[in-house]
Amino acid sequence: MKIGIIGAMEQEVAILKAAISDITEVNKGGCTFFSGQLNGVDVVLLQSGIGKVAAAVGTSILLSEYQPDVVLNTGSAGGFDSTLNLGDVVISTEVRHHDADVTAFGYEIGQMAGQPAAFKADDKLMAVAEQALAQMEDKHAVRGLICTGDAFVCTAERQEFIRKHFPSVVAVEMEASAIAQACHQFQVPFVVVRAISDVADKESPMSFEEFLPLAAQSSSEMVIKMVALLK
């Protein structure tokens, strides 16, 4: 078993990087790959950079050159579900682009030409995420649709657009749909496990900066437990 783990920012991968033994570092395509062992399992940790293009580039290199059996996407997200608070966890059931629109050609809003409308997370990986969550005392989690776009969602207008077109959305962020699409095209199972750094309708940019470390801690803890369960 080899596990690919993807985070966008240095802050989102730092805890995981510190937990990897016999680590080696490779820089390629503007991305950084850390290989080694985590809980006795072979892992490749990708720090992709922010946004969908950076994530797609990094994930494609990860999948083609390192050939992981599964991919876990970690990091922070903005909460849309009313029950979510800072530091809570979201587990993807599916992932969609919220900033794609080729409806003029008969596709659904958020669906790219030639691609499914939604990228479904792997059932087994979702179950492992649930098992990991059960090991985390008093940690609240929501399962559902995660939406991705190349924008930090902090305006009422954009929030309203996303809620209108994706009413079941539980969280938004800036990389997961690109990662999911790459995994779909390479036929590699994936799941997204992120923690909430800011909540819609609140002071999102301010809370993001303040609570990113909390989100990184929560999501990294989940991933470490998942890796142990996948051993």
UniProtKB/Swiss-Prot annotation:
Swiss-Prot/TrEMBL keywords: Amino-acid biosynthesis, Hydrolase, Methionine biosynthesis
Catalytic activity annotation: S-adenosyl-L-homocysteine + H2O = S-(5-deoxy-D-ribos-5-yl)-L-homocysteine + adenine; S-methyl-5'-thioadenosine + H2O = 5-(methylsulfanyl)-D-ribose + adenine; 5'-deoxyadenosine + H2O = 5-deoxy-D-ribose + adenine
Residues annotated as the enzyme's active site: E12, D198
Annotated positions binding substrate: G78, V153, M174, E175
UniProt-listed Gene3D superfamilies: Nucleoside phosphorylase domain
GO biological process terms held by the UniProt record: L-methionine salvage from methylthioadenosine; L-methionine salvage from S-adenosylmethionine; nucleoside catabolic process
Any one GO MF annotation of this record: methylthioadenosine nucleosidase activity
Associated pathway: Amino-acid biosynthesis; L-methionine biosynthesis via salvage pathway; S-methyl-5-thio-alpha-D-ribose 1-phosphate from S-methyl-5'-thioadenosine (hydrolase route): step 1/2
UniProt cross-references to CDD domains, sorted A to Z: MTAN (cd09008)
EC number: 3.2.2.9
GO cellular component, one term: cytosol
Catalytic class of the enzyme: hydrolase
PANTHER family named among the record's database cross-references: 5'-METHYLTHIOADENOSINE/S-ADENOSYLHOMOCYSTEINE NUCLEOSIDASE (PTHR46832), 5'-METHYLTHIOADENOSINE_S-ADENOSYLHOMOCYSTEINE NUCLEOSIDASE (PTHR46832:SF1)
Function noted in UniProt: Catalyzes the irreversible cleavage of the glycosidic bond in both 5'-methylthioadenosine (MTA) and S-adenosylhomocysteine (SAH/AdoHcy) to adenine and the corresponding thioribose, 5'-methylthioribose and S-ribosylhomocysteine, respectively. Also cleaves 5'-deoxyadenosine, a toxic by-product of radical S-adenosylmethionine (SAM) enzymes, into 5-deoxyribose and adenine.
Recorded family membership: Belongs to the PNP/UDP phosphorylase family. MtnN subfamily.
Name of the protein this chain belongs to: 5'-methylthioadenosine/S-adenosylhomocysteine nucleosidase
Organism: Vibrio atlanticus (strain LGP32)
Native organism taxonomy: Bacteria, Pseudomonadati, Pseudomonadota, Gammaproteobacteria, Vibrionales
